[in-house]
């Protein structure tokens, strides 16, 4: 199944306090934290009632498509979020609220492959993109 992927960037620095990042997720009961090593981890969100999942990844290398198109002031920090494209809109909005909290706490910007440059989190705008992508996916795969 297709994933809706958002990538996190910082402006003019790659510095991230990864111990604080991991603590952000560990403090939440709705996350399972899987640490692979000091440079990679998975933070798996499970909605308490719907049981749908989304995953925040910390990776060793960039997963951003067409990274060289964006403004050089924004630096990829190798953290991204994947939400299954057929997730309920309510669930997706809940995940985006967590992404917004994360971005605000760590001064992150977000990037989706159709953006020219990373942007500050705008949940309504991102939900519109998600809903349009989801509709297009369903139209192409009606079953």
PLM features per residue range, with description:
Residues 1-143:
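Acidic (Asp/Glu-rich) sequence patches and key acidic residues
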